[in-house]
Amino acid sequence: MTVTVKKLIERLKLEIIYANDQLLEKEITTSDISRPGLEMTGYFDYYSPERIQLFGMKEWSYMTKMTAHNRYSVLREMFKKDTPAVIVSRDLPIPEEMVKAAEEEGIALLRSKISTSRLSGSISYYLDALLAERTSVHGVLMDIYGMGVLIQGDSGIGKSETGLELVKRGHRLVADDRVDVYAKDEETLWGEPAEILRHLLEIRGVGIIDVMSLYGASAVKDSSQVQLAIYLENFEAGKVFDRLGNGHEEVEFAGVKVPRIRIPVKTGRNVSVVIEAAAMNHRAKQMGFDATKTFEERLTNLISRNEEMK
C-alpha cells in the first residue's frame, strides 16, 4: 500500500511548516524512524536518509547550541532528496536554518504538539500497518467475543452463510471472500477486507448484501488481529476428527503461525454455535483453563481410585 507524506499529516494531525504539493505526495517507503543524534555532530556514517527524521527535545537542544553556520551546514548535509519528511515534536520552535535547508533540499518540514516518544510510537504503528507486506487468503474473518477468527473451507461449504449467522448472533464481520493478512510483528497477524469488498457478504441465492446497512455499524469492523483459524470440511463417515481437543494444528500466514481447528460440517449441525464455542474455548486455554486437561486429570484420578479398590 502506498503511503504519502500527506496521509501521514492527516493521520497524525501534523502542522506543515514547509511543504508543497509535490512534497506532500512523496512516498514513505519504510516504517523505520531516525533520531539524528550523532548526525548533529557531523557523523554521517550509516546514516539512513530514506527514513523520517524525528527531532525531539535532545536533538533540538543540541541544535540550538550550535552556531547558525554549523547548524545550517549539518542540516543541509542531513536533508536528502530521499528523505520523506522531517518532524519536530513537542511544538518546539524551529530555527530559520532548518526551514532554509528544508526549502533548498526539497524536504517536507512538519511539527507536532505531542511528546517525542508518543509521536514516534504513533508513526511506527501507523506505518507498520500500512507498509507491511500483504497476502490475500480466501475465507471469512469475524470478530467473535473480541477474538479474530478466520473461517476457511472448501468453496460452497457455507463460510459466508456461517458469517451471516454469526453477525445475527451479535458478532462483527471484518472481511468476506478475500481477506488481506499481514504481520505486524513476528507473532501478530492482522487481517482486513479488500476495499471494494468492505462490509459486504455474498450469499448464494440471495446475492451481495451490505452488512452495515442491514445490521448497523456495530455489526462490522475494519480490521482485526487473527488469533484463531477454523477450517470447515464435509463430514465423512470413518474420517477421524479430534474429539478431545488435545490436538495442536497450526497454519502459517505471512510468516506468522496461527492455531487451527478443523470442524466437520453436516446437515443439521449449527456451525455458528460450534465456532462460538471454539473461540471461547481457545480464549479459556489462553487464560490457563483447559477443559481437556481437566478431563484427563479426572480420568486419571478415577482410574487410580478404581485400581486402589481392587
From Swiss-Prot:
The active site is at residues 138, 159, 177, 243. One of its GO terms (biological process) is regulation of carbohydrate metabolic process. Signal peptide: none annotated. Mg(2+) binds at residues 160, 202. Its cofactor is Mg(2+). It catalyses: [HPr protein]-L-serine + ATP = [HPr protein]-O-phospho-L-serine + ADP + H(+); [HPr protein]-O-phospho-L-serine + phosphate + H(+) = [HPr protein]-L-serine + diphosphate. ATP binds at residues 153-160. Its EC number is 2.7.11.-, 2.7.4.-. Residues 201-210 are annotated as: Important for the catalytic mechanism of both phosphorylation and dephosphorylation. Belongs to the HPrK/P family. Homohexamer. Catalyzes the ATP- as well as the pyrophosphate-dependent phosphorylation of a specific serine residue in HPr, a phosphocarrier protein of the phosphoenolpyruvate-dependent sugar phosphotransferase system (PTS). HprK/P also catalyzes the pyrophosphate-producing, inorganic phosphate-dependent dephosphorylation (phosphorolysis) of seryl-phosphorylated HPr (P-Ser-HPr). The Walker A ATP-binding motif also binds Pi and PPi. Both phosphorylation and phosphorolysis are carried out by the same active site and suggest a common mechanism for both reactions. This is HPr kinase/phosphorylase. It comes from Streptococcus uberis (strain ATCC BAA-854 / 0140J).
